[in-house]
Amino acid sequence: MKCPVLKAESERKRVSAEKNREYIEKLSKMINCKTVWTRSGENQTEYDRFYSLIPELFPNLAKTAKKLTFGGGCFVYVIEGKNATKNIMLMSHHDVVDGDDRWSTNPFEATEKDGYLYGRGTIDTKTPLFAELQACEELISEGYDFEGVNVYIGSSNNEEVCGDGMVLATEYFKKEGIRFDVVLDEGGAITEGQIPGVSCKSAVVAVHEKSRHTFRCKTQLDASGHGGFGGVSDNAVLRLAKFVAEVSQKTKSIFKGKFYPEVRATFERHAPYMSFPLNLLFGNISVFSPIIKKIMMGIPAASAMLSTGLTFTTISGGDARDPQMRAKTAEATMFLRCVREDDLYAGLEKIKAIGTKYGVTMEEIERDYCQPTDFNGEAFKKVEALLHENFPDVAVVPFLLTAGTDARRFTDVADNILRFAPIDLSKAQFATIHNPDERIGVINVGECVCFYKDFVKGF
């Protein structure tokens, strides 16, 4: 693959220092709200303070857009465009994980230091939310009429705990027959050092995330009996334990690794920015895939990109009120993350065969499937072009997200789902996500606003 010529970082699209200072002051107010979601709701005052900031910081948006709310605080602003035939969704979440005493600053008091803005949510994901809102605020004030497109800005209040915010929102969209041409959520970023041997920064745009499937595995005997009597070699707990052990032992042979298209593209499009011999290896995956796959399958983070992951998360059996009785029933919860459902269900047939041997039945109790987006399609190519325009110093590559986002909720109501925020992360910054000293480069905040303005105008 021909190596595109990258430019200097100084040629990025940016705002003036004065404008960027305004952005930092606004974002800091959002960071200072301790929007940590809890079931008991002890931070509701902080959430309310956060919600009151939105019309204060973005008055034109608040006056112009229609606001939808779902559940305990998930909100969606809707800007109706002129002659609109398309819908686009800019996503984020405003809940954050908590901080602790390992921070060098107060995690809920935005602090500027050494060219960075420290604070919980600066990366995950109050900066993207701020930039999305600010971009639309400015477009409205500039008289932009949003020709041909309705713009939705959605933000969940409980994404970090897999809450119901965006679940309720997508149920509403289904009911109203609203379908999105493209959804843009968190998940990818501008990174460096994440793939060994790459000589430049990369804008990694997730075109897919691994789906989630949960199964109840259960065994039941016709009769129990006292644990002191014979037959201890055949009870529900032992049967289930043998099933769990065998499935766990054979997982890698049941779900063999493969280079899925989006994973192959990640490495092939990075290859021009690698030196020998990595550029040769990853530029010719069809030739060297057996070698590369063998190496990657031995690295947990890498193997997650190539195969279905399986783990047993809960197990129970017998009657705790009468622990001397042999267990008549036992069950376990099996959790899987897959790249493609056909591979998942092919592997499940092998697991069911193991279950038959031990009298274990399986029932799917949750299916959370994600549909991959075509990285050769129009939506990805538009984002790719916007990134080359706004960040001409970075390579742009598709990738598979092995973590999770709220974007998966939109599988049934969106044609294209992309996971990317224009946060520029060094390797050290990347390590602060959900960890102490989360921070964003001060200059990067303005870059984010520029990107989202162009994204809205580009669609």
Give each language-model segment a name.
Residues 168, 226-254, 348:
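A short core secondary-structure module
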Residues 1-122, 142-149, 333:
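Acidic/His- and Gly-rich active-site-bordering loop/insert found
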Residues 117, 123-204:
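Acidic/histidine-rich catalytic neighborhood of metal-dependent amide-processing enzymes
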Residues 171-182, 238, 245-262, 266:
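Structural signature of cysteine-dependent C-C bond-forming condensing enzymes
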Residues 66-68, 83, 192, 198, ...:
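An extended, acidic, His-containing surface patch that forms the Zn2+-binding/catalytic region
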Residues 94-95, 247-252, 352-360:
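A common structural junction motif
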Residues 72, 105, 148, 179, ...:
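Short, solvent-exposed loop/turn segments at the edges of secondary structure
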